[in-house]
Amino acid sequence: MPTINQLIRKPRKSQKEKTASPALQNCPQRRGICTRVMTVTPKKPNSALRKVARVRLSNGFEVTAYIPGIGHNLQEHSVVLIRGGRVKDLPGVRYHIIRGAKDTLGVNNRKQGRSKYGTKKPKA
């Protein structure tokens, strides 16, 4: 327990709150360029080939972002928009690519949850 004099000399430091997505720097989204598009395997007990991209952001950060939905058109040098949000079974993947923004196309033939995958309303 510090004395009053010690607290006057050196006040208490407030604890800094850690953010789940530091590369966004308090912005809702960030633009980036794909440097590598690849598949990774999830941790146990799951098994799949999850599509991810290594993205160099406009603020200089390089992050791994998940590509949601079935099928995608991304390749190296594609311009993408990323948002926060981790993928629980992929360690180190803390961002999602937004479908239907910039060079990323929406998911084809999607009827439900379209807004999350950048799909236009189908013609009746």
Curated annotation (Swiss-Prot):
Gene Ontology cellular component list: small ribosomal subunit
Any Pfam family hit: Ribosom_S12_S23
An example molecular function term from Gene Ontology annotations: rRNA binding
Listed GO biological process terms: translation
Region (Disordered): 1-25
Modified-residue entries (3-methylthioaspartic acid), positions: 89
Highest taxon of the lineage: Bacteria
SUPFAM superfamilies: Nucleic acid-binding proteins
Alphabetical list of CDD domains matching this protein: Ribosomal_S12 (cd03368)
Keyword rRNA-binding: yes
Keywords, in A-Z order: Methylation, Ribonucleoprotein, Ribosomal protein, RNA-binding, rRNA-binding, tRNA-binding
Subunit architecture: Part of the 30S ribosomal subunit. Contacts proteins S8 and S17. May interact with IF1 in the 30S initiation complex.
Role noted for this protein: With S4 and S5 plays an important role in translational accuracy. Interacts with and stabilizes bases of the 16S rRNA that are involved in tRNA selection in the A site and with the mRNA backbone. Located at the interface of the 30S and 50S subunits, it traverses the body of the 30S subunit contacting proteins on the other side and probably holding the rRNA structure together. The combined cluster of proteins S8, S12 and S17 appears to hold together the shoulder and platform of the 30S subunit.
Family, per entry: Belongs to the universal ribosomal protein uS12 family.
Protein name: Small ribosomal subunit protein uS12
